[in-house]
């Protein structure tokens, strides 16, 4: 909708390279910068990711996987915005006057990322799977990202 000024959050969560959750949703607040929109999206995706991590750990325990395997589970979040990565990874965060007012709201997710040893990885914008859920992409890009999601 061209008249809407809210950013759209889009992400996909995979377990063993299989998509288990994907979402596209308008953000409830209006972001004043791209970095702010990305931080809001990171926090929202983490709220969806953490219960899935807990579920995988519970299922692993239920089938008798060694605890060591469960505690060393590799979890990563791919982000294409460098500013959002710096703000998300740094504890205490490196605030700028513009970033301080919204970064305070996401302190919990920075702490969870550190506690759960989740890796935040910089990904090139052309590799960002979430773009399928946030914007119209050219056919070639759509087909490329679709193949990545499907594991082809």
Give the positions of each predicted feature.
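Divalent metal-binding acidic/histidine catalytic loops
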Residues: 1-152
């Amino acid at each position: 909708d061209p008249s809407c000024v809210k950013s759209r959050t889009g992400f996909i969560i995979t377990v063993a390279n299989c998509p288990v959750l994907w979402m596209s949703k308008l953000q409830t607040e209006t972001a004043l910068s791209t970095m702010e929109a990305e931080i809001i999206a990171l926090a929202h995706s983490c709220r969806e990711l953490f219960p899935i991590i807990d579920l995988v750990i519970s299922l692993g325990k239920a089938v008798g996987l060694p605890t060591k395997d469960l505690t060393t589970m590799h979890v990563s979040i791919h982000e294409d915005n460098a500013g959002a990565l710096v703000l998300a990874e740094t504890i205490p965060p490196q605030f700028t006057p513009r970033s301080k007012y919204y970064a305070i709201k996401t302190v919990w997710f920075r702490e969870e990322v550190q506690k759960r040893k989740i890796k935040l990885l910089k990904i090139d914008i052309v590799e960002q799977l979430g773009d399928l859920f946030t914007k119209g992409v050219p056919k070639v890009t759509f087909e490329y990202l679709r193949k990545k999601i499907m594991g082809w």
